[in-house]
Structures are given as structure tokens and as C-alpha cells.
Amino acid sequence: MAVFTAVTEPQLAEWMSHYDLGDVVEFRGISSGIENSNFFLTTTRGEYVLTIFEKLTAEQLPFYLDLMRHLAAHRVPVPDPMPREDGALFGTLHGKPAAIVTKLEGAPELAPGVEHCIEVGQMLARMHLAGRDYTGYQPNLRSLPWWRETVPTILPFLQGEQRELLSSELAHQEAFFASADYAALPEGPCHADLFRDNAMFAHAAPDTGHEVRLGGFFDFYFAGCDKWLFDVAVTVNDWCVDLATGKLDNARTEAMLRAYQTVRPFTAEENRHWGDMLRAGAYRFWVSRLYDFYLPRAAELLKPHDPGHFERILRERLTGVALPGIHTSCN
């Protein structure tokens, strides 16, 4: 979400003339992230986020925006894309597709506790179930085919144990993806990037008995149809880890997984392959961060993430230490 593409005041005025969202009060770039150009937009009608898509094409974009509209209609708290005067959910700005969505209430919780993980686990399961009847389809663009394509471009920059791990884990995941158990895993639309900075929390009402309230999930632009367990693994690998070591925190992990399965119970196949999917979730982000680190794009406010973080997480998932895991009635 770094600002790769700047927007001038006259350009913004012309863009906003195609919306019925009132007059612009404030407009500023968002510096976090590395994929799209994002801006906070406040008008006399409300608060929004303007996104210019740096990689996604106009052909790909309807999947993401229509999914967000579908989830919002099913009472899942997500940003709702705003239609233009012609009814379209996106247009063209600087020759790139761009859209405006509603801004969620609250702020990210960068040091989540058990209660935050419970809220996220329940809502993630609700989101998965709400997406079952979504008719759009887009594969997870950062899954195995992308790993196969990208890893050879990264390997020349690595040596020794790093190089060996990147290659050996790809082979492990190829075998896992080809298995009958993998094929049997439940699937559907997934967020696929549900890190702690992609959710908002607000203060809960005093009469609820809770300290926090989930404001919603956002940044769906890595979403795709994939195994739901992959989405859970990606989420756990961020929300439930010690950031310094990559080790899973038992209390947060158990809280998130138990909360998730109160809404959607895990299957026996999911239970068997929880460890494999935790590795897949870590590998996906190690590969993408290595790629962004060694093959960066020029950007106005680029802040690349440390690839070593997910290398540590992947190595932790390989240690053989008993992991906090999922539970099914088959145990």
C-alpha cells in the first residue's frame, strides 16, 4: 500500500466528479504496505479509501470488488466499494484501475491478545461461510504456480542453508498439493493476507462484556479461491506468533482456532495437515518478501518487509516441536 502513483489536486477533482460522495475535505497517502497506492479520502459524506492498483488488471479487479460487496451484503464487516455515477465499481486513474471503498471504524491492533484472536477467528469462519455462494472465481495468485515461477528468480541471490530451504520446501509443498488429502480440503474465497494490520478494532459498547470489537477486515486485493485452511494458517502465522522468534503463542493460537471452529468445525483432513499448511502459509510470504527485497520496484514511499521474519517462522514450523493445533470430533 505504498504510494507508487501520486495524485495531484486537479486529478483528484476530476476523478471525484464521477462519484456522488460530496466534496473533498482531506486527502493523504498511506505509506504502509508494498503492493498498491492507497490514500485516505475524507469528504462531506464520509470517510473512504482510494486505491490505485499497481499490479491487478481491470480484468482481475471485478473478482475482488464484487467479493467485498458480497461479503458486506452478508453482514461481514469489510470495506464496501462505492459505485461511480455509471454504476461501475472502478475506473481508470493515471492509466491504472482505481476504486473507492468505505473506511472501516477503528484502528489496527499490532499487539493482539487472546480476545482479539477470538474475534478474528470467529469472523474469519463467518467470512468463509458467507463466501460459499459467491459466484466469482479467481485463484490465489500467490499460490503454488507463482512459487514455481518466482523461486528460480530468487535463488541466485541466496546461498547455503537459505538456498537449500527455499528449494526443499517447494518440493515438499508440490507433493502436498498433489495429494488426495489436499484435494479434499474445503475451499472457497479466502482473504489470503489477513495480517494484524489488515483488521480494525474499536472499543466495544459497555454493555457487551467485551473490551474490544472487531471493526472489520480490509485489503482484500490478495484474495482468491483457495483452501480455507490456508487462510487460517496465514492468519495464525501472524496474529499468534512471537514476532522476535516466530514461535507460536499457545494461548492465542488455541483461542483463535477454537473460536473459528465454533462457527465452522474443522475436518479430519484439515486436522491431519495443519502442520503442512502452516508451512505453506509461511513459505508463501517468505517467497514474496524475498522477491520484493531482491527485486524491488521504485516507489515514492516504499517500505519493504524483512524476509527474514518468515524464514524464522518457516524454520520454527519445521522443528518437530508439538504445535498448538486444531481439534476435530475425530480425535
Curated annotation (Swiss-Prot):
GO MF term list: ATP binding; homoserine kinase activity
Catalytic activity: L-homoserine + ATP = O-phospho-L-homoserine + ADP + H(+)
Natural source organism: Paraburkholderia phytofirmans (strain DSM 17436 / LMG 22146 / PsJN)
Keyword annotations of the record: Amino-acid biosynthesis, ATP-binding, Kinase, Nucleotide-binding, Threonine biosynthesis, Transferase
A Pfam family of this chain: APH
Keyword Magnesium: no
Protein name per UniProt: Homoserine kinase
GO BP, sorted A to Z: threonine biosynthetic process
Domain of life: Bacteria
Protein's UniProt keywords contain Kinase: yes
Transmembrane segments: none
Pathway given in the UniProt record: Amino-acid biosynthesis; L-threonine biosynthesis; L-threonine from L-aspartate: step 4/5
Family classification: Belongs to the pseudomonas-type ThrB family.
The EC number(s) this enzyme carries: 2.7.1.39
